[in-house]
A protein has these predicted regions:
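Short, Lys/Arg-enriched, disordered terminal segments
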Residues: 1-9
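Short, well-structured hydrophobic secondary-structure segments
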Residues: 24-70
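Short cationic amphipathic helices and targeting signals
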Residues: 18-25, 96-106
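Long, continuous compositionally biased terminal/linker segments
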Residues: 4, 56-94
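Conserved functional micro-motifs across diverse proteins
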Residues: 11-15, 31, 49, 53, ...
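Terminal, regulation- and interaction-focused segments at domain boundaries
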Residues: 8-29
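Short, surface-exposed beta-strand/loop "edge" segments at domain boundaries and coil↔beta transitions
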Residues: 27-34, 73-76, 86-88, 106-111
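Glycine-rich, aromatic-bearing surface loops/beta-hairpins
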Residues: 98-102, 107-134
Length: 134
């Protein structure tokens, strides 16, 4: 008997109860996080333990991930740097500089809209769009 991994089911499970934002900004990742922390009251920090390393075209690319876990809640925010040295973590979103994943708890529409509006008003932010997992 041959076992097969159902990747579609894994993807569906991973994205269950998540919200995903794509952000275009003219800011460096640390500058963007500093503004998020100041304006949203969050505490995004670089997490080198979950940094993504990709090897493409015989070169290594490193994509930083900033993380913030809300107090008294399982909700965790991950901010992925989508571009490194001309290569993209998610090439289908080349126009997005950052991908923001909210995971491990339900984020209602009011909270998500508040986050989107606050981020849109930050200096250097050009676009904030909610993305789907499809």
């Amino acid at each position: 008997m041959k076992l097969r991994l159902d990747v579609d089911e894994l993807n569906d499970d991973f994205f269950e109860e998540t919200r995903l934002l794509g952000i275009t900004a003219t800011l460096k990742n640390y500058q963007f996080c500093m503004q998020l922390n100041t304006n949203l009251g969050y505490d995004f920090r670089l997490n080198p333990e979950i940094e993504i390393h990709l090897r493409r075209k015989e070169r290594s690319y490193y994509f930083s991930i900033y993380q913030y876990k809300e107090v008294n809640s399982p909700l965790t925010h991950y901010l992925y740097q989508n571009q490194f040295d001309g290569e993209y973590l998610l090439p289908e979103f080349k126009h997005m500089d950052f991908i923001w994943l909210m995971k491990y708890d339900l984020v209602d529409d009011d909270k998500c809209n508040w986050i989107k509006q606050t981020v849109r008003n930050l200096s250097g932010v050009q676009l904030v769009a909610e993305l789907t997992n499809e």
